[in-house]
Amino acid sequence: MKMSERRVGSYRKSTLRCWDWCKEQRTRAYIIWRCLIFLLRWDDY
């Protein structure tokens, strides 16, 4: 019983780590996207 509990705990930890990485990637992509839009608009003027 304790083995399975420990396994679930480690799985949850790795999932949270993956989620943090995904959020970090999304934030970085969003910032790059905003910069690109800003530069494109700047070219239009």
From Swiss-Prot:
Any one cellular-component term (Gene Ontology): plasma membrane
Keywords: Cell membrane, Developmental protein, Membrane, Transmembrane, Transmembrane helix
Cellular location(s): Cell membrane
Any one biological process term the GO annotation gives: shoot system development
Membrane topology: Single-pass membrane protein
A Pfam family it matches: DVL
TM region positions: 22-39
Segments for region (Required for DVL/RTFL small polypeptide activity): 13-44
InterPro entries: DVL
Similarity comment text for this entry: Belongs to the DVL/RTFL small polypeptides family.
Chain's role: Small polypeptide acting as a regulatory molecule which coordinates cellular responses required for differentiation, growth and development, probably by restricting polar cell proliferation in lateral organs and coordinating socket cell recruitment and differentiation at trichome sites.
Record-given protein name: Small polypeptide DEVIL 23
Natural source organism: Arabidopsis thaliana (Mouse-ear cress)
